[in-house]
Amino acid sequence: VCDILIVDNASTDGTAQWLASQPDLFCCHIDRNIGSSGGFNYGMRWAVEVEYDYVWVMDDDTLPQPDALEKLLEADRILGGHHGWLSSKCLWTDGSICPMNRQRVSPYKEISLTESDSGILPAQMASFVSLFLRREMILKYGLPICDFFIWTDDWEYTRRISRSERCYVVCSSTAVH
C-alpha cells in the first residue's frame, strides 16, 4: 500500500485549493513557511507517526521517472533491507546529470555518474530530491534539522546516517530535478 503525503509549506499560489481537489492525496497545510528543512522534518515525522514502513522523500519540483520507485524497492530487496538510505540518480530535463544533486562518497568528493551508469553504488551523502529510507532509520537517526531552513539539511541528514550505515545511489532509479 502506498500513500502520498504532501506538506504544503504555507503556499499562497492556489496550491492548497488544488491539493484539496485531489482525493488520493493526504495533505497537511502549514500556516507559515518553515523552509524546506522544516517541511521535510514535518513530513517525515508525519510518516513515522502513521507507521509507514518506508518513506520516499522528494522535493516539490522532483519528477520521478515512472519506474523510479520500483527500482528503489528492487534495490532494497537485493540489499536485503541492509542500508541506511537509497537515492535516485538525478537528471536535468535534457537527460544529463544534474550537478547540484550529485551524490557524494565523502563531503568533498562527488560520485562521477554518467547518464548511462547502472547498478547500486556506495554513497555517503545525497539530496532530498529522491531519498528512500526505512522508518526504522528515521527512528534511529532522527529527523532533518529545521534550523538549516533551506540549505544543507539533506547533506547533514544523509551523512548522519551514512556514518553508521551503508548507503547507496540506485542508478537505475532516476528523477528529474
Whereabouts are the PLM-identified features?
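Short loop->beta transition adjacent to catalytic acidic/histidine clusters or analogous donor-positioning motifs
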Residues: 1-6, 25-26
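A conserved acidic beta->alpha catalytic loop
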Residues: 8-17, 32, 62
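Short alpha-helix within the catalytic core of nucleotide-sugar-dependent glycosyltransferases
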Residues: 16, 41, 66-77, 155
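A recurrent flexible, glycine/aromatic-enriched loop bordering the glycosyltransferase active site
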Residues: 113-133
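Short beta-strand-to-loop acidic/aromatic patch adjacent to the donor-nucleotide binding site
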Residues: 52-61
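Conserved donor nucleotide-binding strand/loop of the catalytic core
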Residues: 19-38, 42-46
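Conserved donor NDP-sugar-binding/catalytic core segment of glycosyltransferases
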Residues: 67-100
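A short, conserved alpha-helix in the catalytic core of glycosyltransferases
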Residues: 131, 137-142, 147-173
